[in-house]
Amino acid sequence: MGLVSNYLYGPNTLSTEEIHNLTIASYNLKLNPILLIGNIHMPKIIDIIKQVEIKEVCVSNQYKIEDIELLNNSTNSKISISINYENFDYNFFEHIKNNVSSFYYDLNIYRKDVIEKKSLMECESQINQLKSFAKPLYLGGGINISNVKEAIKTISPHGIDISTGLKKSNSVDEEKLKKILDNLGFDEIS
């Protein structure tokens, strides 16, 4: 379950206190929460990780190698890097691959007041380069009813983030979820 820090741009962000409370609730429900965070200095991220007691963190791809090493050496959390079309840097990923457990490729580019959307075709080459590192790759941003099957067939990600595609007010749109599962060949929501 992704918990997006309000230090990031985009929808559905949470305060540190909300993340802490949801982290506890997630562990009680045997769920694996992941903190998505960026736009602040690494020491502050480390403090937040320790404060919310989370076991996995996904940081935006804006940090230096030394920052990723500091994060790795200062916490016991698994580290994932969030990547998009605009901030892709293969050489950087080559240098940090031993400090991260997975990659999260976001088809969206989040800015303060706007979200730029990229197509799967535009990003496919970069995604395939990431797959060469033999680390789990998660795909998100713009995955919805119309493209979820193509995304899975084309990319074969370790997992997909369809949260925005399922949003209905402040809850999950079960009708959209059913359509996505039907599109993937599942008969019913369990």
Regions found by a protein language model. Give the residues of each.
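Conserved anion-binding
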Residues: 4-9, 25-34, 40-147
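C-terminal helical cap(s) of enzyme catalytic domains, especially alpha/beta-barrels
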Residues: 18-23, 68-71, 116, 152, ...
